[in-house]
Amino acid sequence: MDRAQKEKVVEELGQIFESSGVVVVAHYAGITVAQMQDLRAQMREVGGSVRVAKNRLAKIALAGKPSEKMGDLLTGMTVMAYSEDPVAAAKVADAYAKKNDKFVILGGAMGDTILDPAGVKTVAAMPSREELIAQIVSCIGAPASNIAGAIGAPASNIAGILSTLEEREAA
């Protein structure tokens, strides 16, 4: 790789580190090409990506960024999984690590917070943005549906009583 290509890679990595909600770093020694393609496909499904880059270039790209300390994780054969959604890449990486013992999560970064492997698992256990929105909407909508049910209950009770009275008179 010549100098211009290296500069381009450093620039791309810098953009990844700045724009990603989470970056997960893992060792991938011993993983086959097919397994790596499977990981990439799973990441794409959730809007994330996987990148293998030279550790030295990644450390240069991290210089001056809030997640600069993540450079300590970049040793050996490392892969970076990232996504704009702070939970998506962590969920996929954690699930993949459970299925494949050769994929070992080293840690990651979420903004300026450096995550250890347990931190990545904690982030992976969190609900996604869409799930959180759904929970909030259901919490907001629950009182309204309860009120509507309470208002509608007397009318349905009266209708039930009237139908029972009609049945008694008919019998």
Swiss-Prot record:
Gene Ontology molecular function, alphabetical: large ribosomal subunit rRNA binding; structural constituent of ribosome
Record flagged with keyword Iron-sulfur: no
Superkingdom, natural source: Bacteria
A cellular-component GO term for this protein: large ribosomal subunit
Sorted UniProt keywords: Ribonucleoprotein, Ribosomal protein, RNA-binding, rRNA-binding
InterPro entries: Ribosomal_uL10, Ribosomal_uL10-like_sf, Ribosomal_uL10_bac, Ribosomal_uL10_bac_type, Ribosomal_uL10_CS_bac
GO biological process: translation
CDD domains named among the record's database cross-references: Ribosomal_L10
Known partners and oligomeric status: Part of the ribosomal stalk of the 50S ribosomal subunit. The N-terminus interacts with L11 and the large rRNA to form the base of the stalk. The C-terminus forms an elongated spine to which L12 dimers bind in a sequential fashion forming a multimeric L10(L12)X complex.
Chain's role: Forms part of the ribosomal stalk, playing a central role in the interaction of the ribosome with GTP-bound translation factors.
Family, per entry: Belongs to the universal ribosomal protein uL10 family.
The protein's name: Large ribosomal subunit protein uL10
Organism taxonomic ancestry: Bacteria, Pseudomonadati, Pseudomonadota, Alphaproteobacteria, Rhodobacterales
